[in-house]
A protein has these predicted regions:
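Polyanion-binding surface elements
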Residues: 1-33, 53-64
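Short, solvent-exposed alpha-helical "recognition" segments
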Residues: 34-41
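Short Lys/Arg-enriched helix C-cap and helix-to-coil transition segments
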Residues: 41-47
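Exposed, tryptophan/tyrosine-rich binding patches on extracellular proteins
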Residues: 50
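C-terminal secondary-structure termini that scaffold catalytic or DNA-interacting sites
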Residues: 66-72
Length: 72
């Protein structure tokens, strides 16, 4: 039986997340704390990032709901 090779997940840093979402650092932290944004992962003592696929899925879910502020 062949073993499955796990997919490699890309990690993006804060700058890329902010560019993709147009959100400030404080808004990202608030949404994350409320469970409304993907959780960051610790990369090192002073480095964090997010899985790109989770951020993309979050953006897609906003687009399906009509974007922020549309009561979705």
């Amino acid at each position: 039986m062949q073993s499955q090779i796990p997919a490699i997940r890309r990690i993006i840093r804060l700058r890329a997340v902010r560019e993709r979402t147009s959100l400030s650092k404080s808004t990202l932290r608030s949404l994350e704390a409320a469970g409304q944004f993907p959780r960051r992962i610790q990369l090192g003592p002073r480095a964090t990032g997010w899985y790109e696929d989770e951020v993309s899925a979050w953006i897609d879910s906003l687009q399906r709901k009509g974007g922020p502020g549309h009561g979705g």
